[in-house]
Amino acid sequence: MSQQQQPSTRLATTICFMKSALETPERAALPPLLQGASNFRDVGGYPTAGGQRVRRGHVFRSDHLAALTETDVARLKALGVRHSLDFRGTAECTSTPYAIDGVERVALTIEPTVVARMQTLVAQGVVPSTEETVALMCETYRDFVNHNAGTYGRFMKHLLEQPTPQVFHCTAGKDRTGFAAALLLSALGVDRATIEHDYLLTNQLYKRDARLEGQGHPHVMKVLWQVQPEFLHAAFDAVDQQHGGMDDYLQGAIGLSPQELAELQRMLLED
């Protein structure tokens, strides 16, 4: 048997390990704040166009919470977090469940469609180039804008309805969560350059499963397990070109009234 994997076999291995990472709580590296969630961070502290700042200690973003240590849980509770808003898909939640005493998990399901798209390519024996993989990710972000607005609307409404600190997350805390953070910061008046800075922090913080190292096509894995400005730009372009801009998108597809936007800003901004 040849020791060199055929292209379709190698890509199938890539997808297999992606799905494994989506559905397992084990983590390879210790993060700076939470040992079991390397991409956990406060979305507060950023300046707005109106001269205010996003309040710290009220909203946090993260990768999944299924691998938290007892110390992590204690830290989460010390932060006052009472709700976790979970964007993971059905299989992810089933395979990697969590229950944290005193923290209510709210399911805001968005399936990881890029995995399904890659599986289709595997079935066709196709190995996408770096450019094609980037294009797949950009398509995923456009789908967030055009096909998942209802879910993101529920996310924003939940932030409005619950005054206590909350954390929102998906599996890696980079794509579904990254767009959610971009929406929230946009609603609060943070400029896009600053939003992009927050978005790209994932590349410094997120530690993927060590079993993924060396698996599949490196050029595919590099795209799938990092964030790139092009991904976020694709979402913003869809907002601008198909929905008339962020203000219209927030008040249209997302479903926030001007009064609700003002209340969100009152809750989460400070002088």
Question: Where do the language-model regions lie?
Answer:
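Low-complexity, intrinsically disordered transcriptional activation domains enriched in glutamine
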Residues: 4-6
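Cys-dependent protein tyrosine phosphatase-like superfamily
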Residues: 2, 11-167, 179-271
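Ser/Thr-glycine-rich phosphate-binding loops at phosphate-binding pockets of nucleotides
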Residues: 172, 176-177
